[in-house]
Swiss-Prot record:
The keyword 4Fe-4S applies. Gene3D superfamilies: 3.40.50.12280. The gene is nuoB. The keyword 4Fe-4S applies. GO terms for molecular function: 4 iron, 4 sulfur cluster binding; iron ion binding; NADH dehydrogenase (ubiquinone) activity; NADH:ubiquinone reductase (non-electrogenic) activity; quinone binding. Its EC number is 7.1.1.-. NDH-1 shuttles electrons from NADH, via FMN and iron-sulfur (Fe-S) centers, to quinones in the respiratory chain. The immediate electron acceptor for the enzyme in this species is believed to be ubiquinone. Couples the redox reaction to proton translocation (for every two electrons transferred, four hydrogen ions are translocated across the cytoplasmic membrane), and thus conserves the redox energy in a proton gradient. InterPro entries: NADH_UbQ_OxRdtase-like_20kDa, NADH_UQ_OxRdtase_20Kd_su. It is a peripheral membrane protein. Binds 1 [4Fe-4S] cluster. Belongs to the complex I 20 kDa subunit family. This is NADH-quinone oxidoreductase subunit B. SUPFAM superfamilies: HydA/Nqo6-like (SSF56770). GO terms for cellular component: plasma membrane; respiratory chain complex I. The lineage of its organism: Bacteria, Pseudomonadati, Campylobacterota, Epsilonproteobacteria, Campylobacterales.
Amino acid sequence: MQQAPVVLSTLDKLLNWGRSNSLWPLTYGLACCAIEMMATGGSRFDFDRFGTIFRASPRQSDVMIIAGTLTKKHAEFMRRLYDQMPEPKWVISMGSCANTGGMFNTYATVQGADRIVPVDIYLPGCAPRPETLQYALMVLQDKIRRSKAIKQDAPKRLV
């Protein structure tokens, strides 16, 4: 007697597989890196094969890509957008200016996006090539697959 095949997995693996293969970035382009980020949306790099679809609304996004110089006036707005994103959410800091302030070490610039929001992946360069952003998304997918999808200390809701 032959038995039907059974798929054994954990709920964590299933949720992480779905999350890692449907990344929807919120593009937050501020300077030169934004041009390279726009190039990744073209047919040459084809982010659709990774399940990545650029979104304009933070409520539909789970990844924020910060590309370029972050000024102190933009910092509050960027934090508000980050807070509007649903959980789980990830942040990619793209370029030297977003990572460390770059060459703009002035009173008006934030010296690194990680002072405003928690950053998961840093992309070095001025400006990083589209291939680098593509690689960063692949690294983020791997990071999501290895993470815990279900938090043990999550508060229980009473309905």
